[in-house]
Each structure stands twice: as C-alpha cells, then as structure tokens.
From Swiss-Prot:
The name this protein goes by in its record: Adenine deaminase
Entry similarity comment: Belongs to the metallo-dependent hydrolases superfamily. Adenine deaminase family.
GO molecular function: adenine deaminase activity
UniProt xrefs under InterPro entries: Adenine_deam, Adenine_deam_C, Amidohydro-rel, Metal-dep_hydrolase_composite, Metal_Hydrolase
EC number: 3.5.4.2
Alphabetical UniProt keywords: Hydrolase, Manganese
HAMAP family the record matches: Adenine_deamin
Enzyme class: hydrolase
Pfam family, one: Amidohydro_1
Gene designation: ade
Length: 574
C-alpha cells in the first residue's frame, strides 16, 4: 500500500475499510489503557481516536480490550507435527499473528528443499511467518544428517527470500563458535553483514565462554533455566526469550528475573509444542496469562509478547497498535483471564468468537504433501553382548532437555545386556535414516516403559530413527512398521501395533488436519500409557538425540558426551 493512500484516511477525507469502535486499547508505548476507535485501511492502521466514526465495515467492540497481535520469538513448526497451514489454523485463535520460525528440523532432513517447502507453504496465509536460516545443518558431526547447509546455500537463500529470512537460526554449536570453526563463523559473518539477527542457543554457558560466544554477534538466548543464568546473559547484552514448550518449560523459574527496569529485553517463545498441548493450553496467549498469574504486570507481559520481540527482530511496523503499523489486532475480554475473542489480520476478522472465520490456504498449490524417504541399514541386530563391565546410561529429567549420565551395573540374561524394567532402564537404538550408514545402541533411564516399544522418526536435530523398548522383538516390529508408513511414530505392545501416527512430510509432519492429528496423537499417548509410562515421555524421547544440549545423548554414531563433544563407549572401566 502506498503512503498517499493511507494519509487521506487518517485525515478523515476517505473511509477506512474497517472501523473498530468502543475499544479499550492497550498502548504498549505508554502503558496506558485508552478508550478509543481504530480506523484500518487494508493491512495498516490508518488512525486511532474517537474522531473516527465511519467505515465500510463497523465493529462495535463493546469495551473489549485491544492488544497487538502476539509474536512467537522462536518456534519450530515441525515440532507440532502439522503442516504449516494447519499450524497456522491452530495458533491464530490463540492470538498469535506473527512467528519467527527456524526450519532446522526439516532442513536437517531435506536441506534447501525443506526450507523452500516451508517458505512456499506459508506464502499468502493470514499469519506473518518469518524465518531464521538454520545455522546447524548438521547440528554436529557426531550424528548423520540428511543434508548439509553451507555458507553458499545461505547466500542463495538470502537472495531468493530477502524479506522472509530475518535471522540466523539458533547457533547451537557453541563449541564451534569458541573454537572459531571456519564454516560457522563464515555463516555468522554473512548474516550480520546483511543486518540480520544472530540467534543463540547456549545452555549453561557463563563467564569467559559466554563473553566469547557473544563476541560472535549472538544476541539472544532461549535456553536459560535459572534466574541467575538469565540475568548474567541479560547483563552482557543478550535478549532473553523465555521458553515454555511441551518438554522444556522455563517460565516459572525465569519470571522472577523480569522487573520494571529490564523487561524490555525479554520475550516469549514456545520453541517446541505438540498440537495437543496447543489445543489444551494455547500458544503465546497461555504464556502471557500464566506470567500474569505469577504476578507479572499485564502491560509488561503483553509487551514481552509483542513490541519487545518486534523491536529485537527489527519488525518496524509490528508489535503495537499505532498509526502506520500492521493491523494485527487481538480483542480480549480482560487483561487477566485473557480470553481471546477476535483476531483481526489485514483488516479482516480471521477469528470470531474464538474460532477461525476464514478459509486459510497457501497461494502455492504445488506444495508436496509427501517428501523424503526413510532408509536404514537392512542387516542389523539389537543384541548387546555382556562384557562384565558397568555401563553408562542416559537419565531423563522431567520438563527439561538436559539429561544426566549415570553409571550402573547392567541386567544380564544369556550373556546379553537387556532392559532393566525394575529399575526403569530400557534399551534404545538410533538408526541413520538418511543414508543407511549404521546405527548405535544404548540404554535410557526415566521413560517409565514397562512393556513394549516406541519408534519415531522425530529426533532433534538430524531426526534419525529411534526405537526404545523392553524387548528386541517389539523394537524390531516398531522399526518395520515405521518403514512401511514412511516415517512417524509407532507404539508396540505384545508384538502388536497398538497405535501409530504417519508423518509423510519428511518423517516430521502430517498431511492431515490438525483435528485429525490431535485425535491420533491422543490415541497414541493413551497407547503409550498402556506401556506403563506417562504420556508426556514422548517429547523427552524426541530430544534424546540432541547432541548439543548436555549431558549425555545418543545418535546413530553412539553415545555422546555433549560437554566434550565426543563419542563415548557404552561400557565403563571402573
């Protein structure tokens, strides 16, 4: 839209497309609540004031509160297991109108092809979808990825999508930064000279190492787990994204770090949320509501979900309800219960009475719904011979991506190490599903599985095929079924498939509606409970391969000592 089109509307000389009257507007700049009217032309707010009283369409808000559209500072769409359009349909009723998505899940499987898919699939939908170019493809060379995204690829992508790509995705390989890895530093230099943000990922980093990491122009972090960690990073100039995902939930521990003086440098993000979690709890709106419930001032909480994030990413016309800004507006009943009733996007109501009121589809009709193929080694054995030594195992921590290393005496039967159900220890195997180069075997504690097996092609970040279970027969059947459905999640009990969710888009996302996926996921989780465990274990399983978050992880190449970035043996000399 041209400037000369909107100025006559602001002056009252021409009629706006939409007039929202009798609204209580939260001004994120002043912190005041203003009883006023809002005049909108096309995708922009033309004017604010009680002097505006005509419009081609007039909506009486009847004293509802108007806040800016909510912004998710860091999200992986793929973690929802939904196609991008279905993901948009889920989060719009929750008031999210803008996301900064890092497509490094699909990029680690399909490379540039995967990034192209995500960008095209979100073109022309009533959701502002910006992308961070994945910095970690692969995240580490201690696993086998489906692709390598080099500096030359980044240059090509920036030339092709200069306005959709606004950052370098989370720099997970912080050892690479500290060791001045040539390829990684080159990527950072390319993006910073294009005036793009460099997003961080540095769990537990502090002191001199944190200083060195920030020296590489890394300006944000979403991995803080404690108040002291957040305040140290904030004090050194980092913008803190408070994460509240499905598996990793840091809101309660980090809200105490926020105060009236420093809150401008905090934002909210979901990072990874599955669709059932979004359906039950919500999206950024849930984080805002919970933060307010913990005593945070509503104005501060809403700033953290809107203008703070927009300012950080240089989204100059977003994050506020002001003249010339994008008409991304959310109407809520009050600032405490935070019930979202209407969402306006580009002068149109996309949500009415809390429900989608607009057909959402991409302008691209040729986006594939099935891409990628699962490919693993054909000849394998899951048996582990006893060597009369102790073994190192992965220990899961609830609601955390951080795992611990434990040294235990294994359970042995017929000279083979087997799952030790009584002590909550089960076998896990990870297969390279991209090149069929091999697999590794380990053991994990804390899943609660007492019978059966679970297999999945979701495994951050290279998303290799992982299977864990109490016995080899069920594990082998789970692998077989995963191959038949070309990726997804399979649950086995007593040598029978009791539930499955097919994910044909790169083995990560479904091509079905979000309602269908939620129903299947609910059935899947109930089936997992039949194995004796709690259903929230699934998201933990999906992060057991993440070899850039401490302490002990497993990839197709073996057990990984994350802090020292090296492969370690299953057996331990004592």
């Amino acid at each position: 839209m041209k400037i000369k089109e909107i100025i006559p509307v602001a002056l009252g000389e021409k009629t706006p497309d939409l007039l929202i009257k009798n609204v209580k507007l939260l001004n994120v700049y002043t912190g005041n609540i203003e009883k006023t009217n809002i005049a909108i032309l096309k995708k922009r707010i033309a004017g604010i004031g009680n002097e505006y009283n005509v419009g081609k369409e007039i909506f009486n808000a009847k004293n509802l509160y108007a806040i800016p559209g909510l912004i998710d500072a860091h999200v992986h769409i793929e973690s929802s297991m939904l196609s991008p359009i279905e993901f948009a349909k889920m989060i719009l009723p929750n008031g999210t109108t803008t996301i900064i998505a890092d497509p490094h899940e699909i990029a680690n499987v399909l490379g540039v092809e995967g990034i192209n898919y995500m960008i095209k699939a979100t073109e022309g939908i009533p959701l502002n979808v910006y992308f961070a170019i994945p910095s970690a493809v692969p995240a580490t060379f201690l696993e086998t990825s489906g692709a390598i995204l080099g500096a030359e690829d980044m240059v090509s992508l920036l030339e092709k999508y200069p306005f959709r790509l606004i950052a370098l995705g989370e720099v997970m390989n912080y050892p690479g930064v500290l060791n001045c890895d040539r390829e990684l530093i080159t990527k950072i230099e390319i993006l910073r000279h294009k005036y793009k943000k460099i997003d961080g990922h540095a769990p537990g980093l502090s002191g001199k190492q944190l200083n060195a990491y920030i020296d590489a122009f890394v300006r944000s972090d979403h991995e803080c787990e404690t108040k002291s960690e957040a305040l140290e990073k904030l004090s050194k100039g980092m913008h803190i994204f408070i994460r509240e995902g499905t598996a990793a939930r840091n809101l309660r521990s980090l809200i105490p770090a926020v105060n009236i003086l420093n809150h401008f440098f905090f934002s909210f993000c979901t990072d990874d949320r599955d669709p059932e979690d979004i359906y039950k709890r919500g999206h950024i709106n849930q984080i805002v509501k919970e933060a307010i419930g913990q005593g945070l001032d509503p104005v501060i909480a809403i700033r953290m979900a809107t203008i703070n994030t927009a300012k950080y990413f240089n989204l100059r016309s977003m994050g506020a309800i002001s003249p010339g800004y994008k008409s991304d507006i959310v109407l809520v009943d009050n600032l405490y219960d935070f019930n979202i009733l209407y969402v306006i996007k580009d002068s149109k109501f996309v949500v009415k009475d809390g429900k989608i009121d607009l057909k959402i589809e991409s302008v691209f009709k040729d986006v594939p719904t099935t891409i990628g193929k699962i490919n693993i080694t054909k000849n394998y054995s899951l048996k582990v011979k006893n060597r009369n030594k102790k073994i190192r195992i992965i220990s899961i921590k609830k609601f955390s991506l951080i795992t611990e290393e434990s040294i235990v005496s294994p359970k042995v039967s017929k000279n083979e190490i087997i799952s030790d159900v009584e002590n909550d220890i089960v076998k896990i195997a990870v297969f390279d599903r991209h090149n069929a180069s091999g697999f590794s075997i380990g053991f994990v504690k804390g899943t609660g599985i007492k019978n059966g097996a679970i297999a999945t092609t979701i495994g951050h970040d290279s998303h290799n095929l992982a299977v864990l279970g109490t016995n080899d027969k069920d594990m082998e059947l789970a692998i077989k079924r995963i191959l038949e459905i070309n990726g997804g999640i399979v649950v086995i009990k007593d040598k029978k498939v009791i539930s499955e969710l097919s994910l044909p888009i790169a083995g990560l996302m479904s091509d079905e509606t979000y309602n269908t996926v939620i129903k299947k996921l609910q059935h899947l989780k109930k089936s997992i409970e039949k194995l004796g465990t709690k259903n929230d274990v699934l998201m933990n399983i999906h992060f057991l391969q993440l070899a850039v978050i401490p302490k002990l992880k497993i990839t197709d190449k073996g057990l990984i000592d994350v802090e020292n970035q090296k492969i370690v043996d299953l057996f331990v000399e004592v």
